UniProtKB/Swiss-Prot annotation:
Keywords: ATP-binding, Kinase, Lipid A biosynthesis, Lipid biosynthesis, Lipid metabolism, Nucleotide-binding, Transferase. The lineage of its organism: Bacteria, Pseudomonadati, Pseudomonadota, Betaproteobacteria, Burkholderiales. Its EC number is 2.7.1.130. Pathway: Glycolipid biosynthesis; lipid IV(A) biosynthesis; lipid IV(A) from (3R)-3-hydroxytetradecanoyl-[acyl-carrier-protein] and UDP-N-acetyl-alpha-D-glucosamine: step 6/6. It holds the Pfam family LpxK. Transmembrane segments: none annotated. The gene is lpxK. This is Tetraacyldisaccharide 4'-kinase. Transfers the gamma-phosphate of ATP to the 4'-position of a tetraacyldisaccharide 1-phosphate intermediate (termed DS-1-P) to form tetraacyldisaccharide 1,4'-bis-phosphate (lipid IVA). ATP binds at residues 68-75. GO terms for cellular component: plasma membrane. Disulfide bonds: none annotated. It is an enzyme of class 2 (transferase). NCBIfam families: lpxK.
């Protein structure tokens, strides 16, 4: 994992900036984007034409993913969707790749798991929802193992995996943030894994800067709202974000879109110093030792990676709740009750 401010982090930051415009670097990379797009199109066509067959795992599958690289708010969306499906009478389970973990075979994730063995996002989902969560690079194998261990599960939510065509799915939800499709180019010239025109059942847009939605069919606003911060060492100790307004605060985030976390805090009335860490940052040591601040605000995704050895009394965790449009929930429930995996 690259260090904060290291060469890899700087390269990632530059690409992220370049992907928002059609500058010289983006145009120079378009030949590689054409090759990437051709390979991706061949994979899609192989399944669309029946040359390869997706695997039906026996229950409906909802894939929550994106067509861009980087964080868009998928994890809080998965958590909210699991809660909504449970409220609608389903018994959901979750599968994920387990990015950042050394996982080769289907592995169960429990609230007591370690992030290094499960992945930070699956561990957060397990802790927040209490639903069965299994991880494996092969999501079909993860889903089959989950069903064998939990035969009462009647719907599976796939955290990411939109491009994992081998897993048959009933519903596809694509999540965007305010960057939408960036410059509209495929990787590596732009942020797109697939064209924006890719079919999906619904689109969710998480944009803290604007309430306007793009003119796409079946598009819904995704609102991410911060809750009261809880103390890392004493989780029952909570403070409204407004109480940090007159303190020296550092906001740090090792997520795909750290600026979105910082914007959330600013919208809550804070003016923190900020530090963007690499996505899935491992926290092998404390990067905040030399920071002269009263409080350090971090994300839940980062908090699950901090074990008992962390004793920095300044650390506070800011939970985020996703509010799903009731019309979106109704659409998903209708499709689950009316269709088989395909």
């Amino acid at each position: 994992m690259s260090a904060p401010g290291g060469p890899l982090a700087r390269l990632e930051a530059r690409l992220t900036r370049e992907w928002q415009r059609r500058g010289a670097l983006a145009w120079a990379l378009t030949p590689f984007a054409c090759v990437f797009g051709l390979c991706a199109a061949l994979r899609r066509t192989a399944y669309a034409q029946g040359w390869k067959q997706p695997v039906d795992v026996g229950v409906p599958v909802v894939v929550v993913g994106n067509v861009t690289v980087g964080g868009t708010g998928k994890t809080p969306t998965v958590i909210a969707l699991v809660d909504a499906l449970r409220a609608a009478g389903f018994t959901p389970g979750v599968v994920s790749r387990g990015y950042g973990a050394n996982v080769k075979a289907p592995t169960a994730v429990t609230p007591a798991s370690r992030a290094g063995a499960a992945g930070d996002e699956p561990l957060l989902i397990a802790r927040r929802t209490g639903a069965p969560v299994w991880v494996c690079p092969d999501r079909v194998a993860a889903a089959q193992a989950l069903r064998a261990a939990h035969p009462d599960v009647d719907v599976i939510v796939s955290d990411d995996g939109l491009q994992h065509y081998r897993l048959a799915r009933t519903v596809e939800l694509v999540v965007f943030d305010h960057r939408l499709g960036g410059n509209g180019f495929l990787l590596p010239a732009g942020p797109l894994r697939e064209p924006l025109s890719r079919h999906r059942d619904a689109t969710l847009v998480n944009d803290p800067y604007s309430s306007a939605l793009p003119p796409w069919p079946d598009t819904y606003a995704l609102a991410l709202t911060p809750g009261a911060a809880w103390h890392l060492d004493q989780p029952t100790l909570r403070r409204p974000l407004s109480q940090f307004a007159n303190e020296r605060v550092l906001a740090a985030a090792g997520i795909g879109a750290p600026e979105r976390f910082f914007a959330t805090l600013r919208a809550a009335g804070l003016a923190p110093a900020t530090r963007a860490l690499p996505d899935h940052y491992a926290f092998a040591d404390n990067p905040f030792v030399d920071d002269a601040v009263d409080a350090i605000l971090i994300t839940e995704k980062d908090a699950v990676k901090l074990g008992a050895s962390w004793r920095d009394a300044r650390l506070w965790v800011v939970p985020v709740e996703a509010a799903l449009d009731p019309r979106l929930i109704a659409l998903v429930v209708e499709k689950l009750r009316g269709r088989s995996p395909a």
